Amino acid sequence: MNVNIKNLVHAFSKLPSLGPSSSRRLVIHLLQNKEKVMLPLASLIKELADLIIECEVCGNLDTKSPCSICTNPKRDTKLLCVVEELGDLWAFEKGNIYSGLYHVLGGRLSAINGIGPKELNLDTILKRVTESKIEEIIIAINPTLEGQVTAQYIIELLKNLDVKISRLACGIPMGGEIDYLDEGTLRIALTSRQEYELNIK
């Protein structure tokens, strides 16, 4: 195999859900469809790399910061949905089931992987709540063990503030990923969300 082709296969194999075999098939398809697929795709990737930036407010990706969601006057600024990854935000937006604002953490707390609060967009939640008119925080974090630890950290961070903290309702299986849920399940989980019972001493 040509070394340049081999390097491209290796680069694709680093992407989520793409192993060596699927990466090879993808590269072959691109090379065999250079004019129709490969060159337009390369142009789009280059354009996105030049234009897309991270929103300084919520962590979304857009061509401007603050992003189009944060600056949309039609969004409900009293609601803040906290999600792990950008894909979770897109899942809510795709279903058109939520009209509030978002806060993308960029992952979840993981002692094994060395990911602590400083590695995530966590402490900025406190600043957003204290400096805005947010009335409810919806914790939409994947129901994994690490997700539960992250959710508890957020609750401890905000429990003394005058803000409602809720979570998605049952329906999302333990270990499930919000990004992979169908629109109906996600809608029910959101509309039937439950408020956390805080024991403040």
Curated annotation (Swiss-Prot):
<dbReference type="GO" id="GO:0006281">
    <property type="term" value="P:DNA repair"/>
</dbReference>
<dbReference type="Pfam" id="PF21176">
    <property type="entry name" value="RecR_HhH"/>
</dbReference>
<feature type="zinc finger region" description="C4-type">
    <location>
        <begin position="55"/>
        <end position="70"/>
    </location>
</feature>
<dbReference type="InterPro" id="IPR034137">
    <property type="entry name" value="TOPRIM_RecR"/>
</dbReference>
<comment type="function">
    <text>May play a role in DNA repair. It seems to be involved in an RecBC-independent recombinational process of DNA repair. It may act with RecF and RecO.</text>
</comment>
<dbReference type="GO" id="GO:0006310">
    <property type="term" value="P:DNA recombination"/>
</dbReference>
<feature type="domain" description="Toprim">
    <location>
        <begin position="78"/>
        <end position="173"/>
    </location>
</feature>
<keyword id="KW-0863">Zinc-finger</keyword>
<comment type="similarity">
    <text>Belongs to the RecR family.</text>
</comment>
<keyword id="KW-0862">Zinc</keyword>
<dbReference type="GO" id="GO:0003677">
    <property type="term" value="F:DNA binding"/>
</dbReference>
<keyword id="KW-0479">Metal-binding</keyword>
<dbReference type="Pfam" id="PF13662">
    <property type="entry name" value="Toprim_4"/>
</dbReference>
<keyword id="KW-0227">DNA damage</keyword>
<dbReference type="InterPro" id="IPR000093">
    <property type="entry name" value="DNA_Rcmb_RecR"/>
</dbReference>
<dbReference type="Pfam" id="PF21175">
    <property type="entry name" value="RecR_C"/>
</dbReference>
<dbReference type="InterPro" id="IPR023627">
    <property type="entry name" value="Rcmb_RecR"/>
</dbReference>
<dbReference type="GO" id="GO:0008270">
    <property type="term" value="F:zinc ion binding"/>
</dbReference>
<keyword id="KW-0234">DNA repair</keyword>
<dbReference type="InterPro" id="IPR015967">
    <property type="entry name" value="Rcmb_RecR_Znf"/>
</dbReference>
<protein>
    <recommendedName>
        <fullName>Recombination protein RecR</fullName>
    </recommendedName>
</protein>
<dbReference type="InterPro" id="IPR006171">
    <property type="entry name" value="TOPRIM_dom"/>
</dbReference>
<keyword id="KW-0233">DNA recombination</keyword>
<dbReference type="Pfam" id="PF02132">
    <property type="entry name" value="RecR_ZnF"/>
</dbReference>
